[in-house]
Design a protein with these regions (language model features):
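Extended, low-polarity transmembrane helix blocks
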Residues: 1-63, 76-99, 103-166
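Transmembrane alpha-helices and adjacent helix-loop boundaries
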Residues: 69-74
Length: 166
């Protein structure tokens, strides 16, 4: 009986053996690959949104102008407020949603880019409060992980020596 218990505890058989094997396989995934995938996963929704805000080089789309002027409201303490300077906010959001994700994918200034996208996520949360569980919470978690861990070895930060904490 002692041998069967010992085999289960060391991953020798059954479900615990399968779990032990799976853990070993997952441990082979390099941290740098995980951080690269995390950077891409956070960048994609912002980049897609940013592309929709432009009609040409530094020319906001009619849709972006409309939603920032007419539809988007900040929900703060139970009240709704119009965006201050809506066209400026649309322009800055559009720039941020293009520049920051590109930096993130390249791994250039990863912590800065992730912090910027975290700030944008907070503003988006105030604008679309019902999106917190499906979108904003995962975005915030990914951004915080990248702020803490940086871009990893597969990043421009690593090449130029900005990954001091890695």
């Amino acid at each position: 009986m002692a041998n069967a218990t010992q085999a289960d505890l060391t991953g020798g058989g059954g479900l615990s053996g399968l779990v032990h094997w799976a853990n070993g396989m997952l441990a082979c995934v390099p941290r740098s690959l995980s951080l690269l995938l995390l950077r891409i996963a956070l960048a994609v929704p912002f980049l897609k949104s940013g592309w929709l805000k432009w009609d040409g080089f530094l020319t906001l789309s009619a849709g972006a102008k409309y939603v920032f002027q007419e539809e988007f409201k900040l929900h703060i303490l139970g009240a709704e407020y119009s965006y201050p300077f809506p066209l400026t906010m649309a322009f800055l959001a559009g720039l941020g949603e293009i520049i920051l994700p590109i930096l993130l994918i390249l791994g250039l200034g990863t912590r800065f880019a992730a912090f910027g996208l975290l700030g944008m996520t907070v503003v988006i949360q105030l604008t679309v409060p019902e999106g917190w569980a499906n979108f904003h919470l995962p975005w915030a978690a990914m951004a915080i992980a990248l702020i803490v861990f940086g871009g990893g070895r597969l990043s421009a930060d690593q090449v130029i020596g900005l990954n001091r904490m890695d």
